[in-house]
């Protein structure tokens, strides 16, 4: 890690119920960009945990990023984000610096639609082996060019800046996690075991412009993978996924 982001736009604090003393913030929220329609794309940094206090160049520091929503009609990942925000500091490994990105597609979340406001599938718009797919109105439209969308640009810049050691990208509704023959294979298998997700390949072949693929191929020392949740996610299941994310950190290659 060479850079840490510490420029919040808003601060969440907890205050005492008996005094006016302001306690240290549990998290900081900052905007990393705006959507087509001008909505903020916010990231949350858990600053109350020991890992957030480690020096940027500390070899023990592990930066973990969790992305709840890319496709606006796949919102179950938000429940996992909620559980990670609610965890006590003692539940989070001391070396983990935890960052949470609820959605990169606020314009899709608002009307519960897959695409952004330009009708672009953001998970076909990232700048790795991007290819033109379909046209506006098609569910898989990749946009007019690689990283054409402000949401994609914001995430590319932020990930390039933060350089997470591990990123989990949530999707729905395949209820699976893709296996890997690479160095992150044991990590994916452990996640599947902890959550009960079956290990199986993504249907439909190889896709272009995918966020997690862009991240893996651009930053080869980083681990990034997709978790496909089912159609629904109960609170207990969301908590299981939250704990699984933290439990696999020691398996990072």
Q: What residues fall within each predicted segment?
A:
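Short, conserved catalytic or adaptor-binding loops enriched in Gly and charged residues
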Residues: 20-23, 91, 215-219
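Active-site/substrate-binding loop(s) of hydrolase catalytic cores
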Residues: 58-65, 74-202, 229-230
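Soluble metallo-hydrolase cores and metallopeptidase-like ectodomains found primarily
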Residues: 23-57
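Extracellular mucin-like PTS domains
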Residues: 1-22
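Conserved beta-strand scaffold positions in the cores of enzyme catalytic domains, especially
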Residues: 29, 43, 100, 167, ...
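Active-site-adjacent mobile loop/cap segments within catalytic or ligand-binding domains
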Residues: 177-179, 188, 206-253
């Amino acid at each position: 890690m060479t850079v840490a982001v510490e420029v919040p736009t808003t601060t969440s604090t907890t205050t005492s119920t008996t005094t006016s003393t302001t306690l240290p913030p549990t998290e900081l929220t900052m905007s990393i960009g705006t959507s087509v329609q001008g909505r903020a794309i916010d990231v949350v940094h858990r600053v109350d945990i020991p890992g957030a206090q480690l020096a940027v160049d500390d070899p023990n520091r592990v930066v973990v990023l969790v992305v709840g929503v890319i496709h606006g009609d796949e919102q179950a990942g938000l429940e996992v984000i909620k559980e990670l925000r609610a965890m006590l500091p003692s539940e989070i490994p001391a070396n983990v610096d935890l960052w949470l990105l609820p959605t990169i597609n606020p314009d899709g979340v608002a009307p519960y639609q897959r695409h952004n406001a330009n009708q672009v599938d953001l998970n076909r718009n990232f700048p790795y082996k991007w290819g033109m797919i379909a046209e506006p109105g098609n569910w898989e439209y990749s946009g007019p060019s690689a990283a054409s969308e402000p949401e994609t640009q914001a995430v590319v810049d932020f990930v390039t800046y933060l350089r997470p050691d591990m990123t989990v990208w949530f999707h729905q509704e395949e209820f699976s996690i893709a296996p890997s023959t690479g160095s992150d294979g044991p990590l994916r298998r452990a996640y599947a075991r902890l959550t009960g997700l079956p290990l199986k390949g993504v249907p439909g072949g190889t896709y272009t412009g995918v966020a997690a693929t862009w991240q893996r191929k651009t930053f080869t020392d980083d681990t990034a993978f997709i978790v496909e949740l089912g159609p629904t996610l109960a609170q207990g299941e969301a908590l299981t996924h939250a704990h699984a994310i933290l439990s696999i950190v020691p398996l990072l290659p």
